[in-house]
Structures are given as structure tokens and as C-alpha cells.
């Protein structure tokens, strides 16, 4: 049976005291908070990128609408709803939202925890055989997230393997609320 690839040490940079003891600038300009963008994934209407949060010194996941949808008020509302629902669902199997804002062009975005993981689809496509216990564990964790969401009146309308992320520590995260 094939082993799933391990994560690289480079994905987790070391911390140094001089990075944590920097003074905070007098005026925090949200338009200059994020830099070093790198595309991770492209969805039907949105773009997912990693970038550096210059205020907190960490790499985050930055989600925004594709240019052709960025000015559409209906799509903006959907993106805002997704960000707020994700932020309100405080559960180990949901992705935490860090910030919601607008860029220099006035387009909506939100940032989330960046997890160096694989989607359930990637795992299914990679392996020839599966450990049923591991698959059940993934599905149970998804069920926990759904149960939590349902008790808060939230229904996930797009459950599919591409929206389930497995992190390097075995954590299972349900995405795209």
C-alpha cells in the first residue's frame, strides 16, 4: 500500500524572538497588511491564495472572488456570509476565520488559518487501498462538524470530498460554508 506523502519542514518556519518583539506601527493600514500572494486553488467563483500577514507575521489563507465576480453584489454577499458563518462556527472541525475586509479596489476578502493538508478527494485519488478505520474517522469528524452546525441552524449545502481538508496532524476540516 502506498504511503501518503509527509509534510515538509519548510511548511512550518521556525520562530525567532526578533520576529515576536517588533513594535506595532502607529497606524494599521489594512491595504498593506498582506503581501507575497501565492495561488493555492481556484474555485468556480473564488480564488484561494496564501499570503503573509505583515501585522502578525504569519502565513494565512486569503479568499476572494475571481475578478469577473468581484463586483457582483450577490456574490459579494455570499462571500461575506461564508466568512461570517465560518467565524461563528467555533468547532475543531471547521476552519477558523481570522479577518473579513475589503481590498484597495473595495472587493471583499476574508482570511483563514492556512492548513498544509490534502483534500479528501486528493487522498481518495492517491491511494489504491484504504484503511477503513481511517476513512471512518474522517467521516465521523465531518459528522461532528455538521452536527455542531445544525445545532446552530446552519446547513452546509456543498458537502463533497473537495470541501474536506485533512491537515498534517490528522485534523479534519469541513470547508466552504
Give residue spans per PLM region.
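Activation segment signature within eukaryotic-like protein kinase domains
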Residues: 138-139
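AlphaC helix of the eukaryotic protein kinase fold
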Residues: 66-88
